Every structure is written in C-alpha cells, then in structure tokens.
UniProtKB/Swiss-Prot annotation:
Cofactor(s) named in the record: Mg(2+)
Positions of region (Disordered): 404-427
Keywords: Glycoprotein, Golgi apparatus, Magnesium, Membrane, Signal-anchor, Transferase, Transmembrane, Transmembrane helix
Gene: GAL3ST3
Role: Transfers a sulfate to position 3 of non-reducing beta-galactosyl residues in N-glycans and core2-branched O-glycans. Has high activity towards Gal-beta-1,4-GlcNAc, Gal-beta-1,4(Fuc-alpha-1,3)GlcNAc and lower activity towards Gal-beta-1,3(Fuc-alpha-1,4)GlcNAc.
Positions in the Cytoplasmic compartment: 1-19
Glycosylation sites: 90, 109, 176, 301
Keyword Endoplasmic reticulum: no
Pathway: Protein modification; carbohydrate sulfation
GO molecular function annotation: galactose 3-O-sulfotransferase activity; galactosylceramide sulfotransferase activity
Keyword hit for Manganese: no
Annotated protein name in UniProt: Galactose-3-O-sulfotransferase 3
Amino acid sequence: MPPIFQRLQQATKMSRRKILLLVLGCSTLSLLIHQGAQLSWYPKLFPLSCPPLQDSPPRPKHMTVAFLKTHKTAGTTVQNILFRFAERHNLTVALPHPSCEHQFCYPRNFSAHFVHPATRPPHVLASHLRFDRAELQRLMPPGTVYVTILREPAAMFESLFSYYNQYCPAFRRVPNASLEAFLRAPEAYYRAGEHFAMFAHNTLAYDLGGDNERSPRDDDAYLAGLIRQVEEVFSLVMIAEYFDESLVLLRRLLAWDLDDVLYARLNARAASSRLAAIPAALAQAARAWNALDAGLYDHFNATFWRRVASAGRACVEREARELREARERLLRRCFGDEPVLRPAAQIRTKQLQPWQPSRKVDIMGYDLPSGRAGPATEACLKLAMPEVQYSSYLLRKQKRRGGMRLRPEPVLDNPPPRPIRALRPGH
C-alpha cells in the first residue's frame, strides 16, 4: 500500500478513537448531571471514612425502623430523615389515627389501635408516642431496629418550659413565666397526675414508658432497671448535643448512605424565644428536679461515646465533618446561597410554615426560592416540611396507594383527651 494511503488509514482510526472517547465522556457527564438532579450531595467515588463494623460483605439497607420520638430533643429532624427515606424506597410509614391528631394519642400508653389502618403493616414508625414494648412489637415486623434520642436534661427542660408554657398547668402557675422561679420551688407549682404534668417532670423517663415520679435519690434500683429495659430494646440511643455523630452511627447501624441522613434543622426556636445560655445554678436545679432524666442521659451519653470509640473516633468525626459539608451544599442548593431560618410569617410556601405553640414562642422554618419547579424542588420541599404537614401528606398518599377513599374518619372508641394543638402561624 502506498505511504499516503497508510497515513490516511491511521488518521481515520485515530478519528474513530476520538469520537468514541467523546461519546463516553458525554455519557459520563450526563450520568453525573442526572445524579445531581436526584440531590446526591456526597462524592460517591470516594469511600466513607469509617471502615465496616466488622469484616463482612456489604449489607443491604435496613428497611424497618422504629424511632421513639422524644420531646424537645431534635426528634422532628430525625423523623423527617426517616419520612424521606421511606418515601424514596416506597415504604409504609405508621401514622396516627386522626382521633390522635399527629401523635399516637400521647400521653396515653401506645397501642397498635392508635395506628391508621391505611398505614399498616408499617416499615417505619417515627411519630410521638409513649413507649410500650409489647404493643410496638405487636405492630412492627420482626427484625425492626429500634432507636431513640436523648438530650441534656437542663437544656431540654428549658425548651419544654418555653414550648409548653401555655399548656402545662404547672408552668402556667409560675409568676411571669419564670423558669428560675419554677426551679427554685418546683413542688409549689407541680401536681402529679395533672393533665400534661409529664412535660414538667422527667419527660424523658415518661416517654420511655417509665414512672416519671420515681427518684433515683430514693430508689437507685428503679433507674438501673429502666436503663436495662431501654438497652434491651434500643439498638442505638442518639445524643442530641452530638447530632451529626449520632447520624453517622445511625447510618452505619442501618447500612444507609450518607445521602440518606442529610437534613435541615426543623422545629427550631428563634433566638428571642430561648435562653442563650443556662446559668450553672439553674442547670444544676433542673437536673436535680429531673434526676431520673439526668441519670438516663448520663448513662447513655457514656455508652454513646463507647460506641464512637468502638467505631473509631477519628473516622466518626471525619465522617461527621463530611456530613456537615454535604449538608451545607444541599441547603445552599435548596434554599439559596445563604440559607437562613426565618419566622413563619416570612415563609411564603404554605407547606413549609411551622405551627406555633403560642404567641410567646417563634418556631422558625425555611422557604423555597421563587420560580423553581421539578423533582429537585420537590425533594427540597420535603427536606424542610414540618411534621404536621408531612404526616398529613403521607397519610393521603398511603390511602391512595391502598385504594381507600379520602373521606371523614370514624372516631376511635374511648378517644383520648385532645392532644396539644398548635396554633396556625399568625393566629
């Protein structure tokens, strides 16, 4: 073959190779863009920092989870994580019967009868309830992972006092709504057995199914027994003060991806509605009054850090940092370059307006930038959707999936006292 034809043939082969590489490059770029549209904010090409819990093949994601949502512990944010995971994987979420509103007839002991029939049998449970082991195990499938979350009792009590000040009689009796006055002489205002009294004394113990009137000062054995009962059921007790580290342990426990535990902070009070810092003497008094809660928290805070040490503290902290960075990217994409929590009155999107417990407390939320639409916007909406709206949405969706007509619900036999109903924003 003449040299000119050989050079022409080589040039043709090189052109074909370039075209093939160009096609492959475009395909890869298209795939990455598609992943971005699905709100994937973690670089999948890099392994997570922490090694597996043990030398074993990769596990499938765990799909059955019961989360005991305790009060004023960042539980609404955890609930939102679980709701979104359930939606993405077409799982059934246990939701309260309308007679119970958006909680499982709290403060009554939980009963499987409180669950709406359109949401049974469930994969996920995450709404407020008072723990009852037998009833939950009757409802949830075998193999369900049970988790809960605790918060430092002094900070939690300040939040309870602020949030439920208009509903709890013990708090309403206090002159000038003074937390300091209440903690100076709690017995002067507190009445055991009164409606919503559990918000004023050892609320964590009550939520966990314990007797909130017991005191470890009088009966050490009771606290030890309650701790043992919690440890027998719950695979993980998260700690609100170390929320990101808790989510790292949660995703490892459930074999989830980091994307599965990204979040927006929900149900947060405005700075004007909370103490910037609790004085040491006040914190000590709060822990003394809520001694059962303090004992629970101190024990499970210690076991939490043992779990972190077992997983490798450095890698857990590194993964928590990666989680925070991915979360910031997600919030900027969803809510703007400088996402800020804002008062309900400033939120235009009705589905994102958080309910207000009273005129004295401002609960903040997010808003979507105007002019956006599509799957990514829908995902951002769910990320910041308050508990009441998301619960109602999921109930309607699961009714349609089950072929149930959207009609008024019958009232439960022996309905409970009406739970706290928050005022709509602006009311």
